[in-house]
Amino acid sequence: MVLENKTFDEERALYGSSGITVRNCRFDGPQDGESALKESKEITVENSFFNLRYPFWHDDYLSIKNCELTELCRAALWYTGHADISDSKLHGIKALRECHDINISGCSIVSPEFGWSVNNASFVNSSAESEYFMMRSSNLKFENFRLNGKYSFQYVENMEMANCDLNTKDAFWHSKNVTVRDSVINGEYLAWYSDHLTLINCTIKGTQPFCYCTNLKLINCKMIDTDLAFEKSEVEAEITTEIDSIKNPKRGKITLPRAKELIITEDCSQCEIIQAELTTA
């Protein structure tokens, strides 16, 4: 069944639907009804406008294309699985939570607290403005993705990122098994308490990165305007730029052209720091 060029504003307007296509429709109006497509399955939604709360809860096998979910469309997708979302605006707070098997491409996300406790999700050619983005989520992939917002990727597990641009703060805290390639990360206090974080061909900017880390690896990375790095961390790092300062690394090996300052106030004998410019001088 195809529903086309209609407006819905009543409570649970299409509750429990199965196998329908919604095209060029509006979910808006004076009745201000919630949960339009709750408990639905095998749904396709195209070129539609959502200005009401909680439209996609407990859904399964959902396709959303060229749609706008406004800032009044709060908590749009919760407890939903197998959803493909493309070329859409997700602009309501807490737009994605407790979901699984989600694919997002070509989307604009403006949504604080987006993506909490999500399992198995991919993001391609998309952008987000969000605080606490993807907290406690797992099995994630990001490619050609741009983020603006504090406290991102905290407590995430099993994540891969490539060609991303992250402007953030306190990112990757307590994360586990994360690999980031060919990306720029701009933000202070990066990746504290992380475990098995690997960065390859990345640029890192900001004060006090990588403190209290375990199994941290940096391969062919630039560190710009970074000071007080690696405090209390277990690290294997190959850095191609000089660092403002390194402080009390716990264990491992750090290779770099030069550190402007080494702050060693504790026993750091288990961490080797090789400064190439000093070695060849």
Predicted regions and their residues:
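Long, distal/terminal scaffolding or interaction modules
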Residues: M1-A281
